């Protein structure tokens, strides 16, 4: 994974910052297909980043979507449940956040 780069990507949804994580092979100059990754209910974590890097090794640009907002990183099941419940109860909100991440991935150039 020496040439896999993992970087923060900040985008806005309704004026609020969200911070996804982008993984890609920085040694490649050719266009690569993109993959939008939804993390589990614990949000963006070291485990999610490792999965994204592994997929990036296969020739993809991977964006881990931030579903909770910049700086919201649950550290236990209670926090994760509290962060996920609004999205579970409002699928339109979840879709909106996923679409915003997708739009960011689609328009990212590096």
Language-model features and meaning:
Residues 8-110:
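Serine-hydrolase catalytic machinery in alpha/beta-hydrolase-like enzymes
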């Amino acid at each position: 994974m020496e040439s896999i780069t993992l970087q923060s990507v900040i985008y806005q949804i309704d004026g609020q910052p969200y911070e996804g994580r982008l993984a890609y092979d920085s040694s490649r100059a050719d266009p690569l297909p993109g993959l939008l990754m939804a993390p589990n209910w614990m949000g963006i974590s070291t485990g999610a980043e490792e999965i994204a890097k592994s997929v990036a090794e296969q020739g993809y640009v991977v964006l881990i979507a931030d579903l909770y907002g910049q700086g919201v990183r649950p550290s236990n099941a209670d926090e994760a449940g509290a962060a996920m419940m609004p999205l579970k109860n409002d699928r339109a909100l979840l879709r909106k956040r996923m679409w915003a991440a997708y739009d960011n991935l689609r328009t990212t150039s590096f």
